[in-house]
């Protein structure tokens, strides 16, 4: 009875803590990756320093999805996002001698991982890096994109994923990665396409009713 009451009651003094996938905290402030600007009619990214008056006006119930033990460098004054210095990420792309347009799209696709499928666009695509061993694929996936969130919030899709219950392992994450994918990926093509397009997918869970 006590467990049932605690799990279902709504109490302002005992709020339910839910991470915001668009909010990250740093030593010097909080970065909000999606904030509605009513005067412009668009969503924007904003950084709030802990000492600023605007930070004090933020909703205190907001929970950051991850804390980075470092200072945040605010480059909001730079007009073109392509001019923001990212030397380490650039080094991987430039080593492959990609054209600037290809490099730009690598950043675009990486940024889309911080949002739900179809949240800000209807492109129905996901990033996929193809290449030989030691070309930088896993470095970008596991050392950059995966670090956007805590390990518990990033699911891993293996090449030999269990056909029936495999998706249940990644359904609750903010992001999923697949570091090694071959031509014999065990995931059904129809399910994969539905995941990419943002359609409802029936997910079988052991000893439970299927979810979507």
Sequence positions of predicted segments:
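Ser/Thr- (and often Asn-) enriched beta-sheet segments in non-cytosolic proteins
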Residues: 25, 44-46, 202
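Conserved nucleotide-sensing/catalytic segment adjacent to the nucleotide-binding pocket
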Residues: 166-212
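Extended, Lys/Arg-enriched charged tracts that mediate electrostatic binding to polyanionic substrates
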Residues: 2-35
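Short, intrinsically disordered, charge-balanced linker/junction segments flanking boundaries
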Residues: 1, 96, 208-212
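N-terminal start-of-chain detector that recognizes signal peptides
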Residues: 2-5, 100-101, 146-151, 189-196
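P-loop NTPase catalytic core of nucleic-acid-dependent motor ATPases
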Residues: 30-174
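Residues that form generic nucleotide/phosphate-binding pockets
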Residues: 5, 9, 91-96, 195
